[in-house]
C-alpha cells in the first residue's frame, strides 16, 4: 500500500527542482498465495535544489525495514555506489545521498556524489556507517528529452565499481 505519495518534481528524468516523497507498506501472506510471510516498510524522500540554471544539488533519504520470513533477495540493502548492492544487506537499511549535478553544455553534464548508509537488524539498531563517493559523466540522448546516458565510478572503503546508467540515480 502506497501511503502519502507526493511528487512535485519538474521532470521525471532529470529533476532540477521539487520534491518526491513516498511511504510504502506491504505484507506478504500465505492467504494471498505467497510462499513467505513478512512485512515491509519503505520510505523514500528526494529534494532537488537549483543553484543556477547549470548547477543542481540533489538530496535523497531512503529507509527500509522488514520482519518475518523475508526472502534474501527482498531484504533491504544499501543502494549506493562503490560496492555490490547485496554486500550490505540485513533486516533494515537507511541511507542518505547528495549529488552535485552540473551541465557544462546543452547535451553534456557531470555528477559528483557523496553517500552514507547503514544496515542492521532494525532501524533502531543500525551498525557501522558505510561511506562512498562517486563521479560520472552524462550525455543527453535526445535534444527534446531530459533522459541522460551516463558512466559513473563509485568508491567505498571496501571496493569500487563502474556503472553504465540510464537516467539519474534519484
Model region roles, listed by residue range:
Residues 39, 92-94, 131-133, 147, ...:
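Exposed loop/turn and edge beta-strand positions of beta-sandwich/beta-sheet ligand-binding modules
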Residues 29, 153-154:
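Conserved short loop/turn motifs at secondary-structure junctions
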Residues 125-137:
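A short alpha/beta connector and helix-capping loop motif
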Residues 145-153:
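Low-complexity, intrinsically disordered Gly/Pro/Thr-rich segments
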Amino acid at each position: 500500500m502506497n501511503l502519502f505519495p507526493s511528487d512535485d518534481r519538474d521532470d521525471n528524468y532529470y529533476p532540477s527542482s521539487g520534491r518526491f516523497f513516498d511511504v510504502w507498506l506491504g505484507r506478504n501472506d500465505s492467504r494471498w498465495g505467497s510462499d513467505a510471510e513478512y512485512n515491509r516498510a519503505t520510505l523514500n524522500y528526494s529534494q532537488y535544489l537549483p543553484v543556477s540554471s547549470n548547477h543542481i544539488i540533489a538530496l535523497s533519504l531512503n529507509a527500509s525495514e522488514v520482519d518475518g520470513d523475508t526472502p534474501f533477495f527482498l531484504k533491504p540493502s544499501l543502494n549506493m555506489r562503490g560496492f555490490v548492492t547485496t554486500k550490505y544487506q540485513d533486516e533494515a537499511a537507511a541511507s542518505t545521498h547528495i549529488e552535485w549535478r552540473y551541465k557544462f553544455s546543452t547535451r553534456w553534464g557531470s555528477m559528483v556524489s557523496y553517500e552514507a548508509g547503514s544496515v542492521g537488524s532494525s532501524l533502531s539498531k543500525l551498525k557501522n556507517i558505510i561511506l562512498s563517493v562517486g563521479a560520472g559523466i552524462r550525455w543527453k540522448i535526445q535534444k527534446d528529452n531530459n533522459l541522460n546516458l551516463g558512466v559513473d565510478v563509485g568508491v567505498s572503503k571496501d571496493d569500487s565499481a563502474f556503472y553504465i546508467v540510464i537516467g539519474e540515480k534519484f
